[in-house]
Swiss-Prot record:
Reactions accelerated catalytically: (S)-malate + a quinone = a quinol + oxaloacetate
HAMAP family: MQO (MF_00212)
InterPro entries xref list: FAD/NAD-bd_sf (IPR036188), MQO (IPR006231)
Biological process according to GO: tricarboxylic acid cycle
Record keywords: FAD, Flavoprotein, Oxidoreductase, Tricarboxylic acid cycle
Organism: Prochlorococcus marinus (strain NATL1A)
Designated name of the protein: Probable malate:quinone oxidoreductase
E.C. number: 1.1.5.4
Pfam families: Mqo (PF06039)
Amino acid sequence: MFNTPTPDSENTYDAILVGAGIMSSTLAVLLHELEPDLRLLVVEKLSSAGLESSCAKNNAGTGHAANCELNYTPIQEDGHLSTNKAFEINKSFEQSLEFWASLAEKGKLIPKTFLNKLPHISLVFGDEDISLLKKRFSKLSSHAAFAEMEFTMDHGELKDWVPLIMDGRQHSEKIAATRIKRGTDIDFGNLTRSYINQIEGAKSIDINYSTNVENLQQDSEGDWYLSLEGAKNNRIVRSKFVFLGAGGGALSLLQKSRIPEGLLYAGFPVSGKWLICDEEKSTKTHNAKVYGKAAVGAPPMSVPHLDTRWIDKKKSLLFGPFAGFSSNFLKYGSKLDLFRSIKTTNLFSMLQAGLDNIDLGKYLLNQLIQTNEDRIDTLKRFLPQVSPNDWKLSTAGQRVQIIKQTSKGGVLKMGTEVVTSSDGSLAALLGASPGASTAVTIMIEVLNRCWLEKMKSSKWKNKMLELFPSIGTDINSDQEALLAIRKRNDFLLKLI
């Protein structure tokens, strides 16, 4: 234990949330809505909220609802197209909309500051991929969640959907697309700051910026002590509950916590790059989120997409992502992050995961040696008439892909994962996509795993029902409930 006096009441909290990104801010708002008197501390190493992975330019994609992302409907070894992930993510995103709608109804969120309605489109080329898209359309559109999905191979109709993409394209080219008009683009940086703005004036909440968590330890009675190093002062704080929502930085803090569950994990960082266009002639013409299909052998993170994005209220086009490599676990982290994370408990898992993912290694190597001309050539598959000078390369945020020790050895996992201590006193979020778009569902999982007794109480149950009118209902199997909650969400978020 730290050789310091026991923290006084001023330095004792009901919950300490590390990181002021979309995850911690979502959890902070949820806890404050459920019990306003809870003493919460949010600790952020940067100078403001939402500057790392939650920042709009650092996001690999937003508004993930499985409307257009083909990697959420993978083809199995037996040729079967699996839709389980698509329905799971669609339901999770609807829950995010439901939460935002409830806060908007209370006057605590202004939808137009972070949310824009935007069609979601899947676009493919050639007979084989068109056949796959038809199969996806057939399976998804037969269910209420995706009933509004449209399919076309008609060049005239496609020119109406995506005029910039169809400009200069040969009429003989085989191309197909699906579209769902009820899509969105989310500025998660602005949303994060909106969350923080609504709670930072509360007497029960402290937010410390430019403050780093140097270490954390648990005492014999289950309390956590965190050593904080700030720009203004250093201090020791205490809490019954800690959430590590520091993006790529969560892994190193999880390792410092020394909980047995954390020994199962390692991480592999992948940086991202975007081609960005701010030219009005292009941004006015393209108005959609358009996802293609990853090349054979390429990982899901490589799915190319051309997105209309509103970043700090300015409309831009982003194409990518292109992968890069940095040993940082955070964009504003240290080059030593990866090396410091290697322990005797996870080294074998990392080596095994590397051997089992040779294709990923080849993909990353090819990405690293790409020139800007190579990237523009990739963009030309989407935009035959592209003007290269209109597009600038920008570095996005860092992703730390999970490597987990399982009964089969070290496994590289592409999604997100909540890790909790056996006593529920600590939770950490690891991983990447779909991330921010499903933050609400992920944080409800944290509450159910770490605040179970409170979640069972009538007080919290009633509050949850107030925030989530559909809670307890499977909207994927109850069409009437799905349509009702979508009608409410669309009205309150002004998506109609």
